[in-house]
């Protein structure tokens, strides 16, 4: 069997790939591995608003209880809330049932350890090994040793209280639009901003189990971009389905993506002397404009592979405080162990309020270079061809010379599909289009 866990837990189409049976087995194996030898271990379980959440929660919880662990169910809360509450309630582990920004037919199961961090590859492999061994040596307790399920009613309030504590100001006098993606932020985000005194208008906060991420939220911010201008708001904030990411919209209706957010927050933290070693951790996919803006502000960047888990690894290694991705996964390590959309949203608003500048003015420290993406369809065993083929490497060299320091070429094999992604950045969008698609076609031709 191939590896069950991807970069973000176990994901698949609910009831087809991610079945109730698999959820039960993951609950059972996960509870056993993560609470080894602990007396009556406690595991926190939360989920987003997908229709398949109830089915998977019931199965997962059965698995947890079957090995004698206690399941603490916190209902619909953001993924970062599960990471935080696992620590707060001193649970042995946390599990979230969500497929984040993916369409509704997908769902996922992701584990956190007792400290609120995503599991290491080794622990995930151990869970898989137990499932593949058909639970050899895993006890099935009886009588009073069977686990119990507890519903934690105050989870939402506890998370809101934590989120509010991350900024040192109220938001009175600010008019803010929220797009909750019909997802897990639909209560917590709205309540938090209202309790801080902001005038809040909300779209896409009426989840019906099927409309999560559907033409809304951080993956489709177009509606919010119009709405902010129409309603004359100071800014808008868009979350994804499980609210671990957040994008902003300025008062003019422009999208402020994760790169702009890191530029704004990085400069703010540096000016306050709170940016450890004056470093921001970013991925190779961040826009070159971010590197130039941070460099101008005397902030160093450390680059990682794509994926918030790699950003987090680098931050933990060196004690860096701020890192993230263009997609709006921003990690403030002083506050949470994972990307937290609500904390990111509050940080942006507090900086706007404290600086007395508009969001568009704050964002003007960065100029985004045009970026073009092209995909080359390539068999999985030929994904390294761009490193080995002379004609391809000559073409890459030629493009790099043409961009001469005012752009770049990035080639990245997809981790999940038979594709190689070609990304070009520079100043002339039309020319980039021609070059990127030409290079993708060449890679495709040579690989097939």
From Swiss-Prot:
Its EC number is 5.4.2.10. Activated by phosphorylation. GO terms for cellular component: cytosol. The keyword Metal-binding applies. Mg(2+) binds at residues 100, 240, 242, 244. Gene3D superfamilies: Alpha-D-Glucose-1,6-Bisphosphate, subunit A, domain 3, Alpha-D-phosphohexomutase, C-terminal domain. It comes from the Bacteria. The modification Phosphoserine is found at residue 100. Belongs to the phosphohexose mutase family. This is Phosphoglucosamine mutase. It comes from Clostridium acetobutylicum (strain ATCC 824 / DSM 792 / JCM 1419 / IAM 19013 / LMG 5710 / NBRC 13948 / NRRL B-527 / VKM B-1787 / 2291 / W).
